[in-house]
Amino acid sequence: MFVLPGYDAFLGFLLIAAAVPVLALVTNKLLAPRSQDGERQLTYESGMEPIGGAWIQFNIRYYMFALVFVIFDVETVFLYPWAVAFHRLGLLAFIEALIFIAILVVALAYAWRKGALEWS
């Protein structure tokens, strides 16, 4: 018997969510071919002979653009439910959303002024 009776379904979903990836990994380990010859360990380059190593360093600029994208992607995730329920939330929720957007605009302006978005 579970202590919090209202959370039985949540516990069930949590157990299923933990079991599915483990089951997928175990199934893969059991059914995957075991061949480890030298050619299977090479990097795949669309059927061509691999040239050089697969480990290269990426420019840090890609990281900065990805970070800015993630920030504004998360902003969209937070603002979408607000936009759906906008008509029921009232003026206070509108002001809170404006403050949230203003903080992110200030962060974008700061990154822009510091040159984080420059590609030179």
UniProtKB/Swiss-Prot annotation:
Keyword Transmembrane: yes
One GO process term, biological-process aspect: photosynthesis, light reaction
Keyword tags: Membrane, NAD, NADP, Plastoquinone, Quinone, Thylakoid, Translocase, Transmembrane, Transmembrane helix, Transport
GO terms assigned for molecular function: NADH dehydrogenase (ubiquinone) activity; quinone binding
Compartment(s): Cellular thylakoid membrane
Gene Ontology cellular component terms for the protein in this record: NADH dehydrogenase complex; plasma membrane-derived thylakoid membrane
EC number: 7.1.1.-
Reaction(s) the record says it catalyses: a plastoquinone + NADH + (n+1) H(+)(in) = a plastoquinol + NAD(+) + n H(+)(out); a plastoquinone + NADPH + (n+1) H(+)(in) = a plastoquinol + NADP(+) + n H(+)(out)
Recorded topology in the membrane: Multi-pass membrane protein
Record-linked Gene3D superfamilies: NADH:ubiquinone/plastoquinone oxidoreductase, chain 3
Chain ranges passing through the membrane: 6-26, 64-84, 89-109
Oligomeric and partner information: NDH-1 can be composed of about 15 different subunits; different subcomplexes with different compositions have been identified which probably have different functions.
Function recorded in the entry: NDH-1 shuttles electrons from an unknown electron donor, via FMN and iron-sulfur (Fe-S) centers, to quinones in the respiratory and/or the photosynthetic chain. The immediate electron acceptor for the enzyme in this species is believed to be plastoquinone. Couples the redox reaction to proton translocation, and thus conserves the redox energy in a proton gradient. Cyanobacterial NDH-1 also plays a role in inorganic carbon-concentration.
PANTHER family recorded: NADH-UBIQUINONE OXIDOREDUCTASE CHAIN 3
Family per record: Belongs to the complex I subunit 3 family.
Name the record gives this protein: NAD(P)H-quinone oxidoreductase subunit 3
Source organism (scientific name): Synechococcus sp. (strain WH7803)
